[in-house]
Amino acid sequence: YDNNVNGTLRLISAMRAANVKNFIFSSSATVYGDQPKIPYVESFPTGTPQSPYGKSKLMVEQILTDLQKAQPDWSIALLRYFNPVGAHPSGDMGEDPQGIPNNLMPYIAQVAVGRRDSLAIFGNDYPTEDGTGVRDYIHVMDLADGHVVAMEKLANKPGVHIYNLGAGVGSSVLDVVNAFSKACGKPVNYHFAPRREGDLPAYWADASKADRELNWRVTRTLDEMAQDTWHWQSRHPQGYPD
């Protein structure tokens, strides 16, 4: 809450002092909560996020929406991204979480590089094709491109502009494991564990609005996400130096 909510309030204060009125917020698909239909469309009402992270993102969306109502000359973009993965293709920058990773791709990468023995897959009895959870994975470079396009297209265009940034297709946990095994050239050890409370069986984006209005769409595949992650992790087996 301090990072997302208080940090945003401090940034808004600084922007008002500098007379800057274009704001791009990196929001999250978690603001949708549990929806009855997939894919998720921007017109869906926001739900009840399960995590403090999602709740803080929704709070910031509400703050920015109220700000724009009070000061209609502001241009605010709410970019709801789905599951960012991958790394910079140079292999110089990647995700290096401390402790056991919460996100799937770095967890797989640490198993593949030998830092962890096995990947825990939470649930193999979901109503999906292979029984594992399905998510919409997007390469971080596509996500970065989306922010740049939003900055260029929406600058000085008053209003609150909401866009999903996702691939528009779902991939299961085992799909991601198989893509990574192909990227690193060896099997990735995994085991099944009980479902985690609050995890949804499946969801993915309808990103057609971003395609239509921003001329943005993903260009990188799940295989490329795995390849770039492995490139980073294999060059930095222990992550970034302390």
Residue ranges of predicted features:
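Residue(s) in the substrate-gating loop at a strand-loop-helix junction
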Residues: 28
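Active-site loop of short-chain dehydrogenase/reductase
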Residues: 19-23, 73-75, 117-118, 157-161
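Hydrophobic pocket-lining residues that define ligand/cofactor binding sites across diverse proteins
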Residues: 15, 68, 150-154
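Feature marks short, surface-exposed loop/turn motifs that line or immediately flank catalytic pockets
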Residues: 32, 85, 169-171
